[in-house]
């Protein structure tokens, strides 16, 4: 029994760094004032994993419907323990305000054992000033 408990404890401690390291993006929320027909946000997707991942950036409205935003770059590979800036330009579409979700999605590489698609989204609020 004591041996089983020690083994379970060792496994739990050994797996903690795996569970703690999760795909991330910063910032996760923000408000932007703009004097033009669009507002811009710079986000930083990060890869905490030990191998590279393929990343796609998408922009959605509050109901998770796609928004026609300009994203540069929108698809890229992110190395292990790396982060990179991504510029997102969101049109107001004639409105004075716009709430969007900017999402980082990791895409599994083909022929790999794990085929999980992870998504993390931040909330951003644009205000058009006149």
Model-derived regions, located:
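Bacterial N-terminal signal peptides that target proteins for export
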Residues: 1-8
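N-terminal signal peptide c-region/cleavage motif recognized by signal peptidases
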Residues: 17-19
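Boundary of Sec targeting at the N-terminus
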Residues: 22-25
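Short, solvent-exposed loop/turn segments enriched in Ser/Thr/Gly
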Residues: 35-42, 97-101
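Short edge beta-strand/loop segments characteristic of extracellular beta-sandwich folds
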Residues: 40-48, 89
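Short acidic, flexible loop segments centered on an aromatic residue
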Residues: 48-66, 106
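Intrinsically disordered, low-complexity Pro/Gly/Ser/Thr-rich segments with frequent PxxP/GP/PP motifs
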Residues: 65-97
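Terminal connector regions
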Residues: 92-130
């Amino acid at each position: 029994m004591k041996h089983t408990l020690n083994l379970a404890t060792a496994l739990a401690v050994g797996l903690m760094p795996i569970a703690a390291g999760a795909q991330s993006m910063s910032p996760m929320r923000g408000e932007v004032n703009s004097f033009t027909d669009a507002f811009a946000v710079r986000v930083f997707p990060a890869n905490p994993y030990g191998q590279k991942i393929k990343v796609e950036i998408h922009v959605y409205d509050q109901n998770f419907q796609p928004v026609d935003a300009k994203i540069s770059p929108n698809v890229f590979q992110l190395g292990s323990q790396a982060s990179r800036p991504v510029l997102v330009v969101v049109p107001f579409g004639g409105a004075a305000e716009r709430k969007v979700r900017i999402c980082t999605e990791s895409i599994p590489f083909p022929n790999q054992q794990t085929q999980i698609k992870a998504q993390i989204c931040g909330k951003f609020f644009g205000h058009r000033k006149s």
